[in-house]
From Swiss-Prot:
Protein name stated in the entry: S-adenosylmethionine:tRNA ribosyltransferase-isomerase
Pfam (any one): Queuosine_synth
One GO BP: queuosine biosynthetic process
Keywords: Cytoplasm, Queuosine biosynthesis, S-adenosyl-L-methionine, Transferase
Species of provenance: Bordetella bronchiseptica (strain ATCC BAA-588 / NCTC 13252 / RB50)
Enzyme nomenclature, EC number: 2.4.99.17
Gene Ontology MF terms: S-adenosylmethionine:tRNA ribosyltransferase-isomerase activity
Subcellular localization(s) per the UniProt record: Cytoplasm
Family named by the database record: Belongs to the QueA family.
Pathway: tRNA modification; tRNA-queuosine biosynthesis
Summary of subunit composition and partner proteins: Monomer.
CC annotations in GO: cytoplasm
Broad class of enzyme this protein falls into: transferase
Chief localisation class: cytoplasm
C-alpha cells in the first residue's frame, strides 16, 4: 500500500524574485510550460496554445468578475479598519473580512472610504455580517479598490483594475481573479473560434480562501473553503457536443475545474446536469476526474490546495518535475505570472 501523501509532498522552494508583481506587457505575452500526455515538458509561448488545441475541443472559462472588494476606514472609536468583502448575500448586505486592532461587535458602525457607514450585524466564523446604506456593488464600484493577492506588494492602481480582470468577465462576485484567463485577449479568442475550438462558461466566485494555506499535515483533516458556483445548461450541452465529436474538455483555470467537477459530483452516477450552489470540493491525488481532460493554469503556491488539484490531474511526480523546471528556467509565478498547459497522462 502506498504511503499517504502529506503536506510536505506539495512543498517546493521558490525564489521570491520569481513572484510576478505585474502582468506581462500584453495579455498574450507570457510563457507557457506544456506538460504533454507523455509527461514531457516543452517551453513555449502563450500564443502556441492555439497549435495545441484541436477542432471540437471545448474551452471552459470562468466568467466571474472581480469586484472592488477592498475598503478602508475607521471605527467609531477612531481606530483604523480594513474591510474585504468576501460574499454579497443581499443587495445591501455582505460577509466581510475585517482587519482591525480589535474586532468590532454587533451594532458597531464602520465609517468607510470617508463616504458612508456600514453596520456590523453579527459574525459568522471568521467573517462579519455588514449592512450597507445602499447596494453593495454600487458602493464598491464608487469607493472600493481592487483586492490584489497578498504576495503582490504594491497598492492596486488603474493598470490592476484593467489587467486583474479577464476580457470576458460578466458576473460580479469574485475577490480574486481566475488568473489562467488573464492571458486571453480578444484576437486570441477569435483565432481559436476560427480554427474550430469551442467555448463555454461556468461561474465560480473566487473567494479570499483561495490564498489560505493548508495548515495540517494530514490532508484528510483540511477543511476546504466554500465558493459559490453555477454550471448552466448551455455548458452541459456544449460538453455533450464536444464529447460526441471527440473533443476534449479543457478547463481554463482551477476554478473552472472546481465548478465542473462539483457539478459532476452533484450528479453522482447520473449524467452531468446544470448545477449551482456552494462547493467545498477538495481535489487531491487519487481523485478521479469525471469531466476535465486538460487544464490551462498558472503556477500555484507551495503547499496549496490548487497545487494538489493539478497534481491530481497530472501526477505528483510530473508536477514536481515541472515546477523544478519552471524555477530553473525562471518562469514567472502566481497570479500575474506565466501559464502551464497540462494534458491528461496517457493510460
Amino acid at each position: 500500500m502506498p504511503t499517504p501523501l502529506t503536506l510536505a509532498d506539495f512543498d517546493y522552494h521558490l525564489p521570491p524574485e520569481l513572484i510576478a508583481q505585474s502582468p506581462a506587457a500584453e495579455r498574450g505575452g507570457s510563457r507557457l510550460l506544456h506538460l504533454d500526455a507523455a509527461s514531457r515538458l516543452h517551453d513555449r509561448r502563450f500564443p502556441d496554445l492555439a497549435g495545441l488545441l484541436r477542432p471540437h475541443d471545448l474551452l471552459v472559462f470562468n466568467d466571474t468578475r472581480v469586484i472592488k472588494a477592498r475598503l478602508t476606514g475607521q471605527k467609531a472609536t477612531g481606530g483604523k479598519v480594513e474591510v474585504l468583502v468576501e460574499r454579497i448575500t443581499a443587495p445591501d448586505r455582505a460577509l466581510v473580512h475585517v482587519r482591525a486592532s480589535k474586532s468590532p461587535g454587533p451594532g458597531m458602525r464602520l465609517r468607510l472610504a470617508e463616504a458612508f457607514e456600514a453596520e456590523v450585524l453579527g459574525r459568522e466564523g471568521e467573517l462579519f455580517d455588514l449592512r450597507f446604506p445602499a447596494p453593495v456593488l454600487d458602493l464598491l464600484d464608487a469607493h472600493g479598490a481592487t483586492p490584489l493577492p497578498p504576495y503582490i506588494t504594491h497598492a492596486a492602481d488603474a493598470t490592476d483594475e484593467r489587467r486583474y480582470q479577464t476580457v470576458y468577465a460578466r458576473e460580479p462576485g469574485a475577490v480574486a481573479a481566475p488568473t489562467a484567463g488573464l492571458h486571453f485577449d480578444q484576437p486570441m479568442l477569435e483565432q481559436l473560434a476560427a480554427q474550430g475550438v469551442q467555448r463555454a462558461f461556468v461561474t465560480l466566485h473566487v473567494g479570499a480562501g483561495t490564498f489560505q494555506p493548508v495548515r495540517v499535515q494530514n490532508l484528510a483533516e483540511h477543511i476546504m473553503h466554500a465558493e459559490w458556483y453555477t454550471v448552466p445548461e448551455a455548458t452541459v450541452a456544449a460538453i455533450a457536443r464536444a464529447r460526441a465529436h471527440g473533443g476534449r474538455i479543457v478547463a481554463v483555470g482551477t476554478t473552472s475545474v472546481r465548478a465542473l467537477e462539483s457539478a459532476a459530483a452533484q450528479a453522482q452516477d447520473g449524467p452531468l446536469a446544470a448545477a449551482q450552489g456552494d462547493t467545498r470540493l477538495f481535489i487531491t491525488p487519487g481523485y478521479r476526474y469525471r469531466i476535465v481532460d486538460a487544464l490551462l493554469t498558472n503556477f500555484h503556491l507551495p503547499q496549496s490546495t490548487l497545487l494538489m488539484l493539478v497534481s491530481a490531474l497530472a501526477g505528483v511526480a510530473p508536477i514536481r518535475r515541472a515546477y523544478a523546471h519552471a524555477v530553473a528556467e525562471r518562469y514567472r509565478f502566481f497570479s500575474y505570472g506565466d501559464a502551464m498547459f497540462i494534458e491528461t497522462p496517457a493510460p
